Amino acid sequence: MNARRRGVWAVLLLAAGTAGAAPVLIDHRNVDVTRLTLPQIERAKASLHIAYGHTSHGSQLTDGMSGLVDFANGGGQGLALPENAFAWNQSGSDGALDLRDYALCDDVGYYPAWVDCTSNYLSDPAHSNVNVILWSWCGQMDDKYEAGTLTNEYLAPMAALERHFPHVAFVYMTGHVDIEDDADNKAACAAIRAWCATNDRILY
């Protein structure tokens, strides 16, 4: 892992409250925002430049982040941070986190389109400061697991992109609940989680 990627990982680790640990596996248990210090939040906003690709289900993440701004501004959980400490926008202007929502094509279920889109995006000089790529699933993850293509159409291409763009941190994601295909859905999530744990990756 090169120095630039280590630097990005360090910021993500601090933001996750798990400094010194690798891999970074974030789930529903990592929800105590009161553990974050203002210097950690400010460092993340100053250092992270994120491009996020998703369709409908992926908006839960950005909706939640917008809600977090209001939550913190209202002093939720006893927070006493400056106003809009968790603010984000498409450019990082006015001290906000640089999170380019819908920057990438569709979602990660569309292979090979998502791979080509990522490569083209990161190869564009206009995006040279982007150092985090985040892709969300819609409903295809369990289908890929059932078809035996989860590795070839998700895990392996992500690893290839990591090698091609070593200055970028790629955040892996599991999918949303799918009660109609619960077994394959859980198995796919477990496979992605195991891959990230074994290979020291970032998982959200």
What are these regions (language model features)?
Residues 1-9:
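Bacterial N-terminal signal peptides that target proteins for export
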Residues 16-18:
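N-terminal signal peptide c-region/cleavage motif recognized by signal peptidases
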Residues 25-124:
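N-terminal carbohydrate-binding/catalytic regions of secreted carbohydrate-active enzymes
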Residues 175-204:
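Substrate-gating cap/lid alpha-helix
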